[in-house]
Amino acid sequence: MGFPRILSKNNKIYTKLGEFCLSGDSFWIVCHTCQEELQTQDQFWKHIQDEHNFLHGVAKEHSRTSSYCLTDVEAAAAATTPGATASSQGAGSVTAVTVPLALYHCSAKYSDDEQREVELHEAHQQQQQQQQQQLHQQQQQQQRDAAKELAELHANAVAAAAAVAAASDGSARSSSGIDIKVEPATLALPPDMQAAAAAAAAANATIYHLPQLVPAPAPPPTASFVSASGGSTSTTVSTTPPSHQPIMQQQQHQQQQQQQQQTSTTLAMSVNQSTAIAAAALLTGPDLPKDSNSTTASAGSAVSSDDGERWYICDYESCGLKFKYKSRMELHRVVHSKERRFNCDLCSASFKQSCNLSTHRKKKHAMRGIKSELLPQRF
């Protein structure tokens, strides 16, 4: 099991902590500290760890009740093997170990001062535990009291709400013309319950702020509804006055319509002003030059040759180049203008022709693409 053992002459194995006893088929281990017999090595190892605080060959703390000391072991060895000492003396330098080895030397007794300190420490720990238990019990009691108070307040609020509802029902019945006397429910309640009911009623009360409305004149009675059945005619005239709620709704609707009309008129006025300013700016603007930067060919630039083919001539100053297609001439006129329609999507460079843009992309950005990908900028 990881600890040293020595074989003696009487077929017993002695260790620092226990004695392995073999007798026929039976096997047990006797602990040197407490003389307890154990059946297996695992039980013995667990016993010395749990009972005697022995871990990995080192004893951390010596037990007070232990009587296992080096002097006791030597006395027991001298009593059991009296011839061992003589044989060892006759052999000279050779010594035979036949007694169990003591793990450590134990002190004779604990001093009274140490025992008192230990007792005081234990008493202090017990006192702290008792104080903690008392505090815990007090906290639990406070929580229970708070829960009870909340339950009582809830019950009082429910009772007050029921009383207010009953009082409102009674007032409604009395206003309807039925003479029913309802005694307030707060008469049978104690003073504290009455105060809680009054507070709940004040909290539940709702104040409605109604706008001051000018009373409208009474409308004329509605037209009579005539229903003819056969030869008899019955006329029913309804003289029920309209309620105040439809009047309020109509007035609110009229106010909303007026506000919408005002906002629409202000918007229309602002739009008219802006359009008038823009038109005046266009009318008073400078005259455009004759040689504009437009890329479209005029109708007079198309000329027919002697062989019947139609040519498009550039009419920019003294250029005079001829093109077979109108689109080619439009692309050519960009050269004369300052317009740069082809912009690089990777930098801020712009060019007049797509071929220049493709060359720029190949040289500067190492990009190759077809001409259809180079789209001019649209204004």
From Swiss-Prot:
Picking any one GO biological process from the record gives: regulation of transcription by RNA polymerase II
- Principal localisation: nucleus
Annotated membrane-spanning segments are none
Keywords, A to Z? Answer: DNA-binding, Metal-binding, Nucleus, Repeat, Transcription, Transcription regulation, Zinc, Zinc-finger
Which stretches does the entry tag as region Disordered?
A: 114-148, 221-267
InterPro entries tied to this protein: Dev/Hematopoietic_TF (IPR051497), Znf_C2H2_sf (IPR036236), Znf_C2H2_type (IPR013087)
A GO CC annotation given for this chain: nucleus
Extent of Basic and acidic residues compositional bias: 114-124
Q: Where in the cell is it found?
A: Nucleus
As one GO molecular function, the record gives:
DNA-binding transcription factor activity
Q: Which parts of this protein are zinc fingers (C2H2-type)?
A: 29-52, 312-336, 342-365
Bias regions of kind Low complexity — which residues? Answer: 125-143, 223-242, 249-262
* Function, as annotated: May be a transcription factor for genes having (A+T) stretches in their promoter and/or enhancer regions. Binds to AT rich DNA.
- This chain belongs to which protein, by name? AT-rich binding protein
Instruction: Give the taxonomic lineage as stored in the record.
Output: Eukaryota, Metazoa, Ecdysozoa, Arthropoda, Hexapoda
